[in-house]
Amino acid sequence: MTGPNPTDRGKRGTKRHVLTDKKGIPLSVVITAANTHDMKAATDTLDSVIVERPLKKQNLCLDKGYDFPEIERESTKRRYIPHILHRGEEKELIKIGYPARRWVVERTNSWHNRFRKLLIRYEKKSENYLALVCLACCIIVYRGIILG
């Protein structure tokens, strides 16, 4: 899952792209190599949602790594309203009291990191690592929905 890239010199590791609901419950997870840009995994992450979505459009909060016209177009095509903070907008919105929503995904990443098997990747095959990430997501969903 890693390969040479002239900008980060073949950075090693794995990146988890997670789509969550407003409570931080994972709806979709895609893993890529650490040297893969976020833009390349955005459509795969949106397409891998397995729960049935409502017919009305839903809000989709994205960070600056997804600030591309292609991402906005693809998310609109999938009935999402993209909210991407463009460069320089973040400081202005903080001044007027706009609530940050990025912490929801960061908390979900923290929940993933509590599973020691995911914190440091020992698995050689990406399928095995994805299975462990999905198992962790199942436990997070169980704790979030069933246990409240």
Predicted regions, residues:
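Polybasic low-complexity intrinsically disordered regions
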Residues: 1-87, 136
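A broad, low-specificity signal marking well-ordered, structured residues that form hydrophobic/aromatic
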Residues: 16, 103, 133
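Charged phosphate-binding loop/patch that engages nucleotide di/tri-phosphates or the phosphate backbone
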Residues: 132-148
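Generic helix-packing signal
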Residues: 46, 112, 140-142
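A generic structural signal for residues located within well-ordered alpha-helices
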Residues: 37, 41, 100, 127-130
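Helix-centered, glycine/charged polyanion-binding patches within enzymatic domains
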Residues: 54-126
